[in-house]
Design a protein with these regions (language model features):
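Sec-dependent N-terminal signal peptides
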Residues: 3-15
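N-terminal targeting leaders for non-cytosolic proteins
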Residues: 20-135, 143
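Terminal, low-complexity interaction segments
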Residues: 23-29, 176-257
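Short coil-to-beta strand junction motifs in C2/discoidin
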Residues: 162-182
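Boundary of Sec targeting at the N-terminus
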Residues: 18-20, 297
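Short, glycine-anchored, charge-dense loop/turn motifs used at functional sites
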Residues: 291-297
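Residue-level detector of functionally pivotal "anchor" positions at catalytic/ligand-binding pockets or at interdomain
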Residues: 254-286, 298-299
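Extended extracellular/luminal ectodomain segments enriched in beta-structured repeat modules
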Residues: 143-150, 221-222
Length: 303
């Protein structure tokens, strides 16, 4: 009887030990536990870094990841020494920019989920880095395998200007046939993408204009997440649209989760009239029986 009681107690302990973990940016540090601090006067124009992590361009090796929640979440960050060219960065950084002025470090909500001027994550996807290293420039690793539950996504200020007005380098304004897609994938220990889903920051003439909750439960148990972006505005030298996005409130569970998607007041998620299909890692658009690549070319593809 004592042995049976012990086994029952152990089973109860395993049941109550289920845990939900939400990324807490107030706990953010570099790789040697230095707290994240924000610059007060830094940069100009689109690259104004005021209220941005002051080591965004730091070449030090301790800045290759941003840790939160005592290193339960690890966000990739490539400073200029490791990224494309000098004085640049890719991956993720942290921001508290609170003015929507086409700044690459801003978002259209002017702050994180906690309100105006509160911290949020800025992602900058580099197709060049991704192609060079064989996996995305934007990786969030976990300290163990979890079941992703949801994440909040918001349009970046610079990207919004580009797709709304053009005039940001070679970017042109979007029309109703354009799309800007964020591909979120579960990854294995080699950073290989295993399962994916797509959230559209712009589609069918609609644009993300605030924090939107994106369900991740279909990705299944994973050691981390990969983020990639694609756009239909492509030129001679690659994608023209600035590939930035904002992220907050990433939540994972130790146990499997069901769909936890719920509406958010004053936030609109673009609703597509076009069917989007992901096949063998490539995104296609199916409109009126015609199949298009993300570059706008018509292709013959059996679905």
């Amino acid at each position: 009887m004592k042995r049976i009681f012990s086994l029952l107690f152990m089973g109860f302990s395993l049941t109550v030990a289920a845990e939900q973990i939400t990324m807490d940016l107030t706990t953010a540090t570099d790789m040697v536990a230095n707290p994240i601090t924000y610059s007060t006067n830094y940069g100009i124009g689109f690259y104004d870094g005021t209220d941005v992590w002051d080591s965004t361009y730091n070449d030090s090796g301790v800045c290759q990841f941003i840790y939160t929640n005592e290193a339960r979440f690890m966000l990739s960050h490539l400073p200029s020494q490791f990224s494309y060219g000098a004085q640049s960065w890719e991956g993720f950084t942290l921001s508290k920019v609170s003015q929507d002025t086409a700044n690459v470090f801003g978002c259209v909500s002017n702050g994180g989920l906690a309100g105006v001027g509160t911290p949020y994550v800025i992602g900058y996807f580099s197709d060049w880095v991704t192609s060079s290293q064989g996996y995305s420039s934007n990786i969030i690793l976990f300290d163990q395998e979890y079941y992703p539950d949801y994440v909040y996504i918001c349009q970046n200020s610079n990207t919004m200007k580009a797709i709304s007005e053009g005039g940001v380098y070679n970017a042109r304004p979007f029309n109703e046939n354009d799309t800007l897609a964020l591909i979120i994938s579960a990854i294995d220990e080699t950073y290989t993408e295993t399962t994916s889903l797509i959230y559209y920051l712009a589609v069918d003439g609609e644009k993300n204009n605030g924090w939107v909750k994106v369900a991740l439960n279909t990705l299944g148990k994973t050691i981390g997440l990969s983020f990639r972006m694609t756009t239909t505005d492509v030129g001679q030298f690659g994608m023209n649209t600035p590939l930035y996005f904002a992220l907050d409130g990433l939540t994972v569970n130790t146990n499997p989760v069901t769909n936890s998607l719920s509406p958010i007041p004053d936030s609109q998620s673009p609703i597509a009239n076009t069917q989007k299909l992901l096949r063998n890692g490539q995104l296609f658009l199916l409109r009126d029986g015609v199949c298009y690549t993300m570059m706008g070319s018509i292709v013959n593809y059996e679905f």
